[in-house]
């Protein structure tokens, strides 16, 4: 379960997946992003798994409001505190590799209140 949480932490920061207002549950986010875990814990030498990009695109499409994105960010940052081994350099490149554009930096230090 901790590997799934690692993926959720990074990628929800990436796409601002909606967890508030009943739009998407934490379980749905975790399942959508689980295919990204091995990539984010590796060297980045291989291609991003197709299932990872599918999850990122799906969550990005579901993120409709600023409050929902901010709530997701806070949830993910909280979970990230106990997870090791994620390459945040790889995480920051995932949106572009999956054809998703986001207007903020992917980082554990991201200010969730500034996510739009």
Swiss-Prot record:
Name of the protein: Non-specific lipid-transfer protein
GO biological process: lipid transport
Pfam families hit by this protein: Tryp_alpha_amyl
GO molecular function ontology, one term from the record: lipid binding
Disulfide bonds: 36-52, 53-98, 73-112
Secretion signal span: 1-22
SMART domains, sorted: AAI
Main function: Plant non-specific lipid-transfer proteins transfer phospholipids as well as galactolipids across membranes. May play a role in wax or cutin deposition in the cell walls of expanding epidermal cells and certain secretory tissues.
